[in-house]
């Protein structure tokens, strides 16, 4: 197959860098839901206070992104995450679901419902609960210094299938 000469044009280094950057940003944008900077895989935010058009929904996702978790392949609280996705603390999952349900507005409410349905019903990776033995809390922060976690199991068909097929 031949490319017609009229379709080929030399670009300056600056033009090329502009288009490369644009393509890279588009790739990132496809990982988050439209109108948000935090809802999806990764985030597009410049800093912690940077929220998208759907700021209430985005705030839910941002809080969830900064919650207690165990990344795929890592161990924390004596529990190894053998799945393909990050495993979240069940308290974080409950707070995230409540936050999504509390989002109001015609468009933003529908967007929050879509995130909730996708994340909990389809993705549904399950979560972990941490039990802290008595006397194992830090006096300063009330944080559990020697907790043990248990996994709840997948709740969504998508996570179950991916973890089983790739496991």
Curated annotation (Swiss-Prot):
Localization, UniProt: Secreted
Propeptide: 136-140
pH dependence: Optimum pH is 8.0.
Reactions catalysed, as given in the entry: a 1,2-diacyl-sn-glycero-3-phosphocholine + H2O = a 1-acyl-sn-glycero-3-phosphocholine + a fatty acid + H(+)
Membrane spanning residue stretches: none
UniProt keyword list: Calcium, Calcium channel impairing toxin, Disulfide bond, Glycoprotein, Hydrolase, Ion channel impairing toxin, Lipid degradation, Lipid metabolism, Metal-binding, Neurotoxin, Ryanodine-sensitive calcium-release channel impairing toxin, Secreted, Signal, Toxin, Zymogen
Disulfide bond sites: 39-61, 60-99, 67-92, 90-127, 132-144
Cofactor(s) named in the record: Ca(2+)
Major enzyme class: hydrolase
Family note: Belongs to the phospholipase A2 family. Group III subfamily.
Protein name in UniProt: Phospholipase A2
């Amino acid at each position: 197959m031949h490319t017609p000469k009229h379709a080929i044009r030399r670009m300056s280094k600056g033009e090329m860098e502009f288009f490369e950057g644009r393509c890279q940003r588009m790739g990132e944008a496809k990982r988050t839901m439209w109108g948000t900077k935090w809802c999806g895989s990764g985030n597009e935010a410049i800093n912690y206070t940077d929220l998208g058009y759907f700021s209430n929904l985005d705030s839910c996702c941002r809080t969830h992104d900064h919650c207690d978790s165990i990344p795929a392949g890592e161990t924390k609280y004596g529990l190894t995450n053998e799945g393909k996705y990050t495993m979240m603390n069940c308290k974080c999952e409950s707070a995230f679901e409540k936050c999504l349900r509390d989002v109001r507005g015609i468009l933003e409410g529908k967007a929050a419902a879509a995130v909730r349905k996708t994340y909990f019903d389809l993705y549904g990776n399950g979560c972990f609960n941490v039990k802290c033995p008595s006397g194992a809390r830090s006096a300063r922060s009330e944080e559990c210094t020697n907790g043990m976690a248990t996994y709840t199991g997948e709740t969504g068909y998508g996570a179950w299938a991916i973890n089983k097929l790739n496991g």
